[in-house]
C-alpha cells in the first residue's frame, strides 16, 4: 500500500532502538521506550501561506530524523509501523555516521 502525505505532513518509519546500553547491559523489551528516531519515507509538497505561496519542505525521503516521542499518528503499512506527523514535529535531521542504518 502507498501513502502520500498531504501539505506539510511527513511519513516516518521508526528506527529500532539499541538492544544494549553503552555500558554493555542488555535492555529487555518491556523496558524499551518507543524510538524517537526514524527514516523519512515520504513527504507532502509543503505548507501554503495565507497568500497562496508554497513553503517547501526542509526534509526529504531518506533523511534520518529525530522527533518528539509523542509526535504523529501511528499507521501500519504492509505490517510495518509508521508515523504520520507534521514537519514541525521533527526536531532535527541526523547527518553523518550517526544517521546511517
Curated annotation (Swiss-Prot):
Record InterPro entries: Chaperonin_GroES, Chaperonin_GroES_sf, Chaprnonin_Cpn10_CS, GroES-like_sf
PROSITE patterns with a match to the protein in the record: CHAPERONINS_CPN10
4Fe-4S keyword on record: no
GO terms for MF: ATP binding; metal ion binding; protein folding chaperone; protein-folding chaperone binding; unfolded protein binding
Record keyword Cytoplasm present: yes
Biological process according to GO: chaperone cofactor-dependent protein refolding
Compartment(s) where it occurs, according to its Swiss-Prot or TrEMBL record: Cytoplasm
Pfam families per UniProt: Cpn10
Cellular component terms (Gene Ontology): cytoplasm
Sorted UniProt keywords: Chaperone, Cytoplasm
Entry's family note: Belongs to the GroES chaperonin family.
Role played: Together with the chaperonin GroEL, plays an essential role in assisting protein folding. The GroEL-GroES system forms a nano-cage that allows encapsulation of the non-native substrate proteins and provides a physical environment optimized to promote and accelerate protein folding. GroES binds to the apical surface of the GroEL ring, thereby capping the opening of the GroEL channel.
Quaternary organization: Heptamer of 7 subunits arranged in a ring. Interacts with the chaperonin GroEL.
Name of the protein described by the UniProt record: Co-chaperonin GroES
Protein's organism: Lawsonia intracellularis (strain PHE/MN1-00)
